[in-house]
Amino acid sequence: SLRLGAQGPVLSVSSACASANHALGLAMQQIRAGAADIMLAGGSEAMLCLGGVKAWEGLRVLAPDACRPFSLGRRGMVIGDGAGVLVLEAEDHARARGAVVLGRLAGFGMCADAGDILAPDPGGAARAMRLALADAGLSAVDVGYVNAHGTGTLANDRSEARAIRDVFGPNPPPVSSTKAMHGHAIGATGALEAIACL
């Protein structure tokens, strides 16, 4: 804020793997509400330290080699460090200043699954996707690609696949996860995946 001279709403979001997604969604809501014309939103994480690695090792979810989301050969997740920030801007404001628009955040939904950190309830993910579709004014048939959380753990991938089938039916759009490229960067993941999808 000091370096950029930025003013307006400022907040920190701490909701584990969903932190950056929540930051992006909340920034979009602030713009829609007229609280700001431009918001910087994203996430960062530095998990590659002894304590961070040991915590995940204790959960027995780390792959010995690589992250392979939704693959029959998946063996777990890989921890990643990273950071990503996106500039979100009201469409009319962006056009007025001649900005190059790379994408559009159309809708947002969040929902706790009230399950287990290692075995999430697919109902929570399905509700979040439905809320995002409703917020965007879209239906499932309007979606051409799903960027999944896709940790590469058997429990998460199965749960997420069930949630996607629940929302999109037996013939969902193409689904993948970028975690095979950057690992699971926990609080930064949503921002890294949003950038990759652009």
Which residues are covered by each model-predicted region?
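Condensing-enzyme catalytic core mediating Claisen C-C bond formation in acyl metabolism
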Residues: 62, 66-138, 144-145
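Beta-strand segments within the central parallel beta-sheet cores of soluble alpha/beta enzyme folds
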Residues: 11-15, 36-45, 100-108, 141-148, ...
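Short glycine/threonine-rich loop-to-helix capping motif typified by GTGT followed
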Residues: 114-125, 151-168, 185-192
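Conserved small-residue
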Residues: 20, 27, 56, 87, ...
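Conserved catalytic cysteine-centered active-site region
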Residues: 1-26, 35, 54-79, 161-191
